[in-house]
Amino acid sequence: MSDEIPAGIAMEPIFVIEATYAPDAAETRPRHRPTHLARIAALRAAGVVLEAGAFPDLSSSLLLVRAVDADAALAVARDDVYLREGVWVEARVRPFVRVARPDEIPGPADHPPGAAAR
């Protein structure tokens, strides 16, 4: 078994944030959702958030984030209206290695502030 990465494949170190919803999130989320979604869209456009979404049962949300370290990744959640207003009660961050095409991973000049280098 080889550790060699096949041609056309790149490995990008990123972070996964899992944010746990409060028990009353079904009631509190709607009033904050437009602000939350606008921010996520802006972070996606900036290349900081790669993917984001919630589990249908509102147990938690997942975000895939480019950041220089775990603290910077966690700041993405800390700065979100959902965590500030109690829609999320906790956010955890874990390092993750994403399999991607080389052209999907920005070079050093393309990195948004606080984003991880490859």
Question: Where are the regions that the model predicts?
Answer:
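Conserved, structured core segments of small domains
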Residues: 2-118
